[in-house]
Amino acid sequence: HRNVVFKDGGDKACQVRPFSAMDSEDVEDLWAFLARYERRTDGQVLAIGHNGNLSWGRMFSLTDYNYDPITADYAQRRARWEPLYEITQYKGDSETHPAISPNDEFADFERWGRKFTEGEDREEFEEEKRGEYVRAALLRGLEQEVKLGENPFKFGVVGATDSHTSLTAASEDQFLGKMPTNAPSPFRVSDLGAAKFAASGRTAVWAESNTREGIFDALSRKETYATTGPRISLRFFGGWSYEQDDAFRSDLSGVGYAKGVPMGGELSLAAKGQVPSFLIQAQKDPLGANLDRVQVVKGWYSRSGEQHERVYDVVVSDGREIPSDGSRVAPVGNTVNIADATYTNTIGDGELSVVWQDPDFD
């Protein structure tokens, strides 16, 4: 399903009857409803796709509701009305899956979706996962842009809890489960499925003002990111002229906007021989654990029609060095005491900043 967000107040939103699955299960009918709303009220609205890690490959399918191949018109409308997608929530994240990111040691974090089972067709299983997870969807979008002239999966990401209890806790110390039966009670132990859920899902928005309008505008331009719970502060800019010293400027965000575009933006075309640079800063949750590293995941669609993915460590903590061959750094360590569910901040860093260039840019 989709979550629908209105920029406007009740004076406009109440002019239409809410659209639901009782009206239609075809997402194109929802898009038509959103278009009618904007024409009728001169308001603004957008839809956010629900975490699709249990969608059996349908969330990012290359066919429509009737199983016909998607068209350029379909792709254009999906990108128009669904600029964001929910990448994480209580039932796990939908960034990627070990089956389709086998070289990413973190790909199995808080995994809910089923794993490959013996006797199953591996190619069919992997194709199903590509229709459920974000990284694969972004690559599919690049492929469809070549084939259709439009990219249906050109979205930013958000996080949410998807709580079914009205208690939207994203922190472990406040987590009471996803369903009413997960809450503390004499019957809680009978719901063994509750162990699969995890506190998760925050959306961070770089808005110009803390108002409904300001937040909606930031959502629309995709200047957002998601975390699995920690209140990590992240800045990410792309440009052609960032310098290493920019990563340590007190006005880092000002430099970021002046020299490039923020997360969700589009870089201008490169001049011949130019290599893009990325200005990145991550700060830990003030009440949370230190940071191990910052990674950049690169996906590209080759001239031969193949999809590729590579994960880069771009800055790491505790004075460690990234090997010149690009191989990844071992984890910083682990101070977790499983017996009492505590940790100490004796390893890692509170802030990591870098200007990074892709050493393999073509």
What are these regions (language model features)?
Residues 10-18:
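Substrate-binding surface in catalytic domains of secreted glycosidases
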Residues 12, 35-45, 51-65, 70-362:
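C-terminal functional module detector
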Residues 24-28, 132-135:
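Conserved phosphate-coordination/catalytic loops
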Residues 25-30, 67-69:
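Well-ordered, non-membrane alpha-helical segments in soluble/globular domains
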